[in-house]
Each structure stands twice: as structure tokens, then as C-alpha cells.
Swiss-Prot record:
C-terminal DNA-binding domain, as annotated region: 542-584
Residue ranges, annotated region (Inter-domain linker): 458-541
Purpose: Required for activation of most nif operons, which are directly involved in nitrogen fixation.
PROSITE patterns in the record: SIGMA54_INTERACT_1 (PS00675), SIGMA54_INTERACT_2 (PS00676), SIGMA54_INTERACT_3 (PS00688), SIGMA54_INTERACT_4 (PS50045)
Keywords linked to the UniProt accession: Activator, ATP-binding, DNA-binding, Metal-binding, Nitrogen fixation, Nucleotide-binding, Plasmid, Transcription, Transcription regulation, Two-component regulatory system
Pfam families: GAF, HTH_8, Sigma54_activat
NCBIfam families named among the record's database cross-references: nifA (TIGR01817)
Organism: Rhizobium etli (strain ATCC 51251 / DSM 11541 / JCM 21823 / NBRC 15573 / CFN 42)
Oligomeric form and interacting partners: Interacts with sigma-54.
Positions annotated to bind a divalent metal cation: C471, C476
SMART domains given in the database record: AAA (SM00382), GAF (SM00065)
Protein name: Nif-specific regulatory protein
Length: 584
């Protein structure tokens, strides 16, 4: 494959020469990256995943069309995914983006910006170009998809150029480069599975099958059982399936979820299912130690390195050599320590505190946080380069309110543990199970365990009934978390704590994503109210779809953002459920 030389292109301008007017609010970009990361971690074939990424791009960028082209080992187009046509392979890939354009981006390894494709020789090499729009000027932006300095493909967008508005190339390139970084990790993961002779993720799934149906279809894969993980809800099983696939590799995993969702259990599961299972599993809570002590704990120290260092000590990285290291609350480390950690992750080498000898370590890293790292990066509180190092495979753990069907099994398992510890033989009555199933549990499994232990301790008979629960006697202090801002005499959740909650799995407001700079977080509410997410999760797929359409004013694109889907999937779901779109 002949590449064009890396030289200025007719009709294209270098990035620095273009005006740097703001393209959109930072909140929109954060929401876009979050939605794309969810698409990339969903179980599906690579072609379908990339097509869904393009659909998400079209929801967050004002574009005419977009495309992702994946190159094979010889540099030839292998997959071409767009939002308008089904994913294509080699023959159709050449018609999506001109071959000369792909060659130019692959050769230079740099973004390509063309303000008017009709004036660029790269776009005139093929007859009847599909990107041509007559006399309307079309601008083009493309970036390479790279991993370890190897070009895996390209991501590109084009839009109708508006001479009255500034050309927002800088913001577009930055956003597309972040997307390309995430896409490159997914491509490498799929290729690794193919080399290992394993069935690609989602190989037998239909491209047209919407995510609503996927989530509601337990049994599309044989269920995976992990010790310590209790539940068979679709939301939990999807995470378990992802964990079982990711565990076979050495990729860094970022576990995200609210407090009490079981991040440490899943980290342990990844280690036990990995080839490193016979090596050490070491864990450390980064928020529990000050920066100076944290450095010594992770990297170790030499004798006499500081007051009290009476002997040489190995750090957690050395102790986990050959195995797995879990860094919990990774979002709480200081910027200065982030730079030190980044070097270890990049080079695989470290020096003990007070030492000069460089030590090589082989560690599989798992990080966990309930903090919104995208917002922290935007606010310069968390290094972007470290974010990309630790967020290779992000896995979002569902809160308990999104899997209420698992509450009875969890409650019985927790009660069995209590019985063994206290030599009791307590059981739950059906009314007791009903009470717990209707609770909101802002503290997730940790709060459920608190509720079970308190109720079991105070139970007056061997069978726990509904009247034994504190909430039935107006003594449940956790219910104060359900009071919203402005409630008379109510206690509200601290604003700083809310800012540390990661984005919800799907936006529940009627507005479009990114309409505000603030990333919405789950607000505690009355579990018996109709607006509570715990009750919403029990609605049927058809009810959720109609509710989202009504909130969006029957605009499919807005409803897609509310549901966390693409407009195409919403349209398919409307046809599948025979829902007539209202004209307002």
C-alpha cells in the first residue's frame, strides 16, 4: 500500500493556523466520552460496536456524517463503520473515505483538517465522491487511531461548512483524539481474542437488536458464576460477562460505581479468573493514607530514608510482582503523586523512597473509584495522561436500585452469614422480603447488610416480619438520605459528596445530555415515589420507551439520549413495540 508523503495538503490547513473558538461546552464532551465508553464495553461484535460509536458521535457533534475505518496488518481497510449504513468490510470501506485520505492520515500519524473538500486533491482522486454535496462547502476532520505508535485505523467526521461561524477544529480534534484512544483499546482487545481462538464478543448478536432488548434477555450467554457475587439480574450478569472476558488479559481495569456496589469483590474476581491467580493479590486504599505514607506504601523505602525507617521495606508494587494490585479510591490521590504513579505505569520501573536502584515490576493493575474522573480531568484535578493509562477497560458496576430482583437473594445470604456468626436460625418472612425489595438503599449492598444485621439483632422471634424493620417504626436514619434539597427540616446530601459521584448509568432527566456543565448524579429520593429510579427499573421496556419519548416531546434523538441508546435503536424499538409516534 503506497502512502502519500507527509506534506501540506491543498485545501487543508495545519491545526495551529485555524481559529480556536470553543466548539461546545466541556460538559458535552465529558458526557460524550462517558456514553462512548459504555458502548465500547458492551458485549457486541467489533463492527457493531464501532457503528454504535459513530451513532453516539452524531448525537454529540454537529456533523453531516462520521466514519471509523479499521486497517488490517498490511494497512488495507478491513472494517468501515458509519452511522448511515451497516458496517462494511474491505470492498465497501474504500467508498466511505477516499483511499488517499486514509493513506495520508496513516502515513503522517497526525490529524488531517480540510476546510473545503472540493479544493483538496485528496478528495478528487476517486470518481463520483459520496462526500460531495454540490455547491455546498463540506469540511473534513480525521484523526488516526493509534496504539503503541501503530496505526490501527482512522476516525473522521465531515459537516456542512458555515462561513458565518468560526471553524471549530481545535475542539473537534481534541475530542476525536480522546475517542480514538478509547477505540484503539477496544480494537486491540478484539484482536487479542481472535488470536487466542476465542469467539469474538457478541459474535452471534443481531446488529439490529436494540440495547433495551439485550438487557432484558437473560440467557443470551451461559451465566457465569463468580464466588462472592450474588445475583442474576441482567445488569449484574452483563458486568460478570465482561469481567470474565477481561480477566484473561493483562489490560488495566477501572472499576467504577457508587459506594457499596462491590468493587473490591469484582477486583478479586478478575484476579481469580486471570492467569495470575496463583500470584499475589495486593490491595491498597489510596484515600486512607497521606501522600508521604502512600508513596512509601506503594514503592517501598530504604533503611534511613526518613525518620523511623529502621529497615528496608518492599512496597505494594514489589509485593504484587507477577500478580495483581488493586488501588482503591484512585481518584483521591494528589496531582504530585499522580505524576509518580504515571511513571511506574508507563515504564514498569520504580525506585524505593530514599533509594537509587531501579526495580522492574510486572503487575496487573486494577483501579477503583466512585469519583467522576472525567470532571476531575476537565477541572485539572486529575491528569489526563494518567486517566488514559488506568481507564483502558472501564467497568461500571450497577447500583442495587437497578437490580431489585437480586435483593431477596442478597438478604438471605447476609442473614445466613449473621446466623453462622451468632449461632442463630433466623429466617425472613415473605412480608419482610417485600419491605426490603421496595427500599431504595442509597448505600447499596453495604446499606442492605446494615439493615439485615440491625433487624436480625433486634428480632424477637425466629421469623423476621415487616414490623421488625426500623423503617416501619419511623426509626430508620438512612431514610433521611431520601429527603431532597429544600425539604422542611430534612437533611440533604453534602454538595461535595454529590460532585464525587460518577455519572449515572443512564440519564433520567428530560433534557439533552450535556445541556449543563455539571454531570448529573443520582439524587436520593422517596423509594415509594413514582420518580424514584428504584421503581423505574421495574417498568416494562415498552413503558420506559413511551416515558422517554414523552419527556423528549416525541423527538427520537432526545429520547435516545435519555435512554442511553442511539436514534436508530430507538426507531427500531418503536417499530418493534408498535408505538405510534405522536406529532406535536
Amino acid at each position: 500500500m503506497t502512502h502519500m508523503p507527509a506534506r501540506p495538503v491543498d485545501g487543508a490547513e495545519p491545526l495551529s493556523a485555524l481559529p480556536a473558538g470553543p466548539m461546545r461546552q466541556a460538559g458535552t464532551q465529558r458526557s460524550g466520552i462517558y456514553e462512548i465508553s459504555k458502548v465500547l464495553t458492551a458485549p457486541a461484535r467489533l463492527e457493531i460496536t464501532l457503528a454504535n460509536v459513530v451513532n453516539v458521535l452524531s448525537s454529540f457533534l454537529q456533523i453531516r456524517c462520521g466514519a471509523i475505518v479499521v486497517l488490517d496488518a498490511e494497512g488495507q481497510p478491513e472494517i468501515a463503520a458509519t452511522g448511515d449504513i451497516p458496517p462494511s468490510s474491505q470492498s465497501a470501506a474504500r467508498g466511505v473515505i477516499p483511499k488517499a485520505v486514509i493513506d495520508h492520515i496513516a502515513t503522517t500519524g497526525m490529524p488531517l483538517i480540510v476546510k473545503d473538500v472540493s479544493k483538496s486533491e485528496l478528495f478528487q482522486a476517486e470518481p463520483q465522491p459520496p462526500w460531495s454535496s454540490g455547491t455546498v462547502p463540506i469540511s473534513f476532520i480525521g484523526v488516526p487511531v493509534k496504539a503503541d505508535n501503530k496505526i490501527l485505523g482512522t476516525i473522521s467526521i465531515d459537516r456542512v461548512r458555515n462561513d458565518a461561524a468560526p471553524f471549530p477544529a481545535d475542539e473537534d480534534v481534541r475530542f476525536l483524539t480522546m475517542v480514538a484512544n478509547l477505540v484503539s483499546r477496544t480494537i486491540r482487545l478484539h484482536r487479542f481474542l481472535n488470536l487466542e481462538g476465542r469467539r469474538p464478543i457478541g459474535e452471534q448478536e443481531r446488529p439490529e437488536k436494540p440495547i433495551i432488548a439485550q438487557r432484558g434477555a437473560p440467557g443470551r450467554h451461559p451465566p457465569v458464576k463468580i464466588d462472592g457475587i450474588i445475583g442474576d439480574s441482567p445488569a449484574l450478569q452483563q458486568v460478570v460477562e465482561t469481567v470474565s472476558v477481561v480477566a484473561r488479559t493483562n489490560s488495566t481495569v477501572l472499576l467504577r460505581g457508587e459506594s457499596g456496589t462491590g468493587k473490591e469483590f469484582f477486583a478479586q474476581a478478575i484476579h481469580e479468573l486471570s492467569p495470575r491467580k496463583n500470584k499475589p493479590f495486593v490491595k491498597l486504599n489510596c484515600a486512607a493514607l497521606p501522600e508521604g505514607v502512600l508513596e512509601s506504601e506503594l514503592f517501598g523505602h530504604e533503611k534511613g530514608a526518613f525518620t523511623g525507617a529502621i529497615a528496608q521495606r518492599a512496597g505494594r508494587f514489589e509485593l504484587a510482582n507477577g500478580g495483581t494490585l488493586l488501588l482503591d479510591e484512585i481518584g483521591e490521590i494528589s496531582p504530585a503523586f499522580q505524576a509518580k504513579l504515571l511513571r511506574v505505569l508507563q515504564e514498569g520501573e520504580l525506585e524505593r523512597v530514599g533509594g537509587t536502584k531501579t526495580l522492574a515490576v510486572d503487575v496487573r493493575l486494577i483501579c477503583a473509584t466512585n469519583k467522576n474522573l472525567e470532571m476531575a480531568v476537565a477541572n485539572a484535578e486529575f491528569r489526563a495522561d494518567l486517566y488514559y493509562r488506568i481507564s483502558v477497560v472501564p467497568i461500571v458496576l450497577p447500583p442495587l436500585r437497578e437490580r431489585p430482583g437480586d435483593i431477596p437473594r442478597l438478604a438471605n445470604a447476609l442473614l445466613d452469614r449473621f446466623n453462622k456468626e451468632n449461632q442463630r436460625e433466623l429466617t425472613f418472612s415473605s412480608s419482610a422480603i417485600e419491605v426490603m425489595s421496595q427500599c431504595y438503599f442509597p448505600g447499596n449492598v453495604r446499606e442492605l447488610e446494615n439493615c439485615v444485621r440491625r433487624t436480625a439483632t433486634l428480632a424477637r422471634s425466629s421469623s423476621i416480619v415487616s414490623s421488625d424493620f426500623a423503617c416501619k417504626n419511623s426509626q430508620c436514619l438512612s431514610s433521611l438520605l431520601w429527603k431532597t434539597d429544600g425539604s422542611p427540616g430534612g437533611i440533604t446530601v453534602d454538595g461535595h459528596a454529590r460532585s464525587n459521584v460518577m455519572p449515572t448509568s443512564s440519564p433520567r432527566s428530560g433534557g439533552s445530555i450535556g445541556a449543563s456543565d455539571e454531570v448529573s448524579s443520582v439524587k436520593a429520593c422517596d423509594p415509594h415515589g413514582s420518580g424514584c429510579p428504584a421503581m423505574e427499573s421495574r417498568l416494562t421496556q415498552r413503558d420506559r420507551l413511551i416515558e422517554a419519548m414523552e419527556k423528549a416531546g416525541w423527538v427520537q434523538a432526545k429520547a435516545a439520549r435519555i435512554l442511553g441508546l442511539t436514534p436508530r435503536q430507538v426507531g427500531y424499538a418503536l417499530r418493534q413495540h408498535r408505538i405510534e409516534v405522536k406529532k406535536l
